[in-house]
């Protein structure tokens, strides 16, 4: 089965590539009730987004996107530096949202304002009088109450989210996990874990990671700050990181479906570690999805209606997928009803997320779908349970 899924994915990419919509980036200015200034946002949609109208995409939120390099690196690395799911079930396409931190001299608002809270332990270090801090709760509210609803309303999203940050924005991303559970998954590159008398490290040490029952991915990394540049970054930086990384490495703190990954890149300095670290993180994340999300079945059950459309359909069309009602990935899973010579349909009650594919009774004769991205077809939530898939007219079935 695995080999056939890979062949299908490759065939779909080749056959659809000539007609697929190019990837695009939209620049957006958003008013916010939490800020006196507009927030600048970048939204990337992958190749084929408009064509693949039956695909709902996970969303990656990238902070510090005012440094356009960081935002662009994420979608570029996914396309050229990440290994695909070896079983072909997990797609490689994401919607990516870049959140820019401003430099506003007229109101003395800067990047650190976005990523630091008000101090609990006095005005020292990053919290000295005249420094910039205190608005991280407002940024969380903006993301949760304004940006995420905007993205969900205007784009086809799965509901699953990943937050990525570097340095102070990495600290912010980790803080979002322990204070707001803002994202499902987290990538933190060279986080500052020592500010405000190790506030973040202390909070992570006290956080009940096992309270989350659904799959989760947590990645954190450090560059040469603690091994080769301690005189610049200080003993506190090293101590904070060691406390956080110790927790993340200890699997006893987590449920089995939580995957943690901790890396160090001592050959790279603080800023330049972003590329190798995010490359490693995204590869780990794809594998996490392949192993932990493809096999995950939630408790929610919903009625679904699924159609497969094409010309002169045969009467031996099957749907198969990740649960008993879908045949548990047996090639000859559940036979669909031939409504007409152009429509096969089926109504089921499925656990969500439901993942499935179409065959003619064997993996050598798997359907090639024109209006969905590669990987398994997925129904993520009860709001989008009617799906209509179209066979590729030129070559609708593998092996025919």
Task: Go through the PLM ranges and name each one.
Residues 1-5:
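Positively charged n-region of N-terminal signal peptides that target proteins for export
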Residues 21-299, 320, 324-325, 339-344, ...:
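Non-catalytic cap/lid and distal C-terminal segments of serine-dependent acyl enzymes
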Residues 22, 303, 333:
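Beta-strand-rich binding-surface signature
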Residues 115-116, 348-352, 391-395:
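Secondary-structure transition/turn motif
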Residues 302-310:
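A short, amphipathic beta-strand motif
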Residues 309-353, 361-381:
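Aromatic-rich carbohydrate-binding modules that target alpha-glucans
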Residues 312, 384-400:
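Compositionally biased low-complexity segments at domain edges in trafficked proteins
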């Amino acid at each position: 089965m695995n080999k056939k899924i890979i062949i299908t994915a490759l065939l779909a990419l080749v056959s659809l590539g000539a007609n697929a919509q190019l990837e695009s980036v939209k620049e957006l200015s958003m008013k916010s009730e939490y800020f006196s200034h507009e927030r600048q946002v970048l939204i990337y949609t992958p190749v084929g987004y408009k064509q693949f109208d039956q695909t709902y995409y996970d969303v990656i939120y990238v902070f510090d996107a005012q440094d356009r390099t960081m935002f662009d690196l994420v979608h570029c690395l996914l396309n050229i530096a990440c290994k695909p799911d070896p079983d072909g079930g997990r797609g490689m396409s994401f919607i990516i949202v870049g959140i820019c931190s401003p430099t506003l001299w007229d109101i003395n608002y800067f990047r650190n304002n976005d990523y630091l809270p008000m101090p609990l332990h006095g005005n020292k270090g990053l919290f000295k009088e005249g420094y910039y801090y205190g608005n991280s709760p407002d940024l969380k509210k903006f993301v949760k109450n304004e940006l995420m609803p905007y993205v969900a309303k205007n784009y086809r999203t799965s509901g699953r989210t990943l937050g990525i940050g570097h340095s102070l924005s990495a600290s912010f991303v980790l803080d979002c996990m322990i204070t707001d559970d803002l994202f499902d998954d987290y990538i933190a590159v060279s986080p500052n874990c020592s500010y405000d008398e190790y506030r973040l490290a202390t909070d992570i040490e006290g956080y009940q990671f096992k309270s989350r029952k659904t799959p989760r991915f947590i990645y954190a990394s450090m560059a040469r700050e603690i091994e080769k540049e301690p005189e610049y970054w200080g003993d506190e930086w090293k101590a904070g990181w060691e406390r956080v990384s110790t927790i993340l490495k200890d699997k006893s703190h987590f449920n089995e479906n939580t995957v943690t990954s901790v890396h160090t890149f001592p050959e790279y300095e603080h800023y330049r570690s972003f590329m190798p670290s995010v490359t490693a993180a995204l590869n780990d994340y794809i594998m996490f999805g392949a192993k932990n999300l493809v096999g995950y079945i939630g408790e929610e059950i919903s009625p679904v209606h699924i159609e497969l459309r094409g010309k002169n359909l045969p009467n031996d069309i099957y749907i198969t997928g990740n649960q008993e009602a879908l045949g548990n990935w047996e090639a000859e899973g559940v036979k669909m009803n031939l409504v007409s010579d152009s429509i096969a349909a089926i109504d089921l009650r499925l656990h969500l997320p439901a993942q499935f594919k179409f065959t003619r009774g064997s993996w050598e004769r798997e359907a090639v779908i024109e209006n969905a991205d590669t990987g398994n077809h997925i129904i993520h939530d009860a709001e989008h349970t009617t799906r209509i898939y179209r066979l590729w007219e030129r070559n609708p079935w593998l092996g025919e």
